[in-house]
Amino acid sequence: MNITAIIYDADARRTAYILGTVIGNCKLFPAERAPRDWSGYANVITVTASEDGPVVTAGLQKRVTFRPKGEDETVAAAELIGKAFCPPEAPMPTDALKARIDAFLEAHNTLALATGCGKWVRCTPLEYLRVDGRLYILTEGGLKFKGIWWNGAISAAVFDSYAGMASLAGLQMTGTAVYIDPLSDEYRSVIEARGVQLQQLQQMPAMLHAVRLDITRYELLDGALRADGYAARQVLDLG
């Protein structure tokens, strides 16, 4: 695991907190308590205070210095630094990773679906089903559709109850929600896969809406992968 040390001046600690949380796998030190032994750290970031705002220097052999203008710019910079400092470790072959993700989804049936627009966000627990390898939810509606209709962007998570780091298992997904026309063949196939006939559907007090989740990025965290020589965190980017 690549650990990053962040050394900060007291007047710039909020910038350090933002960097440390977004980058991840960081340890933060006030300047007066900076470690003398750097052998346990793959990277170092210093955050100093100046009259014009925080000054950030990132890297060991190759250093980059910049002055973030505001918290939004700090967050954006932290995301880029995180990608540079924390490249994928011991990745699985793509086909093997796809099979692992498929097996994980087949072994579960409930996800947490996050949608949002502007400063408004919503996270809803939902049962899901898979039809021809695609991921769907059926729902009577609700505020989650506010975000779906606004921008379609979704994030979803499927996970086991925590029982220790060795057995830790969860899947984060990012993608787009697509509303399925209730008059389409696709809608009919999803309803039938759920075990509901159209005649039964017509007798229900409220309509069932079908939404397809087109996933562009999977992030699998599976502690059991270490036994096979792979990193616990694996990423499958389809976007």
Predicted segments with their positions:
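Generic beta-strand structural signal
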Residues: A49, G116, R130-V131, L213
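Short active-site oxyanion
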Residues: I3-T4, V44, D132-Y136
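Short, charged N-terminal beta->alpha structural module
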Residues: M1-R33
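Charged, gly/pro-rich active-site loop segments
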Residues: A42-N43, V47-D95, L168-G239
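A short mixed-secondary-structure module that forms the rim of ligand-binding clefts
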Residues: R36, L129-A163
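Hydrophobic residues embedded in beta-strands of well-ordered beta-sheets
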Residues: P54, V121, L135-Y136, Y218
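Short, basic/aromatic recognition patches
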Residues: P87-L111
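A short, Trp-centered hydrophobic/proline-enriched beta-strand micro-motif
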Residues: A103-G118, I154-V158
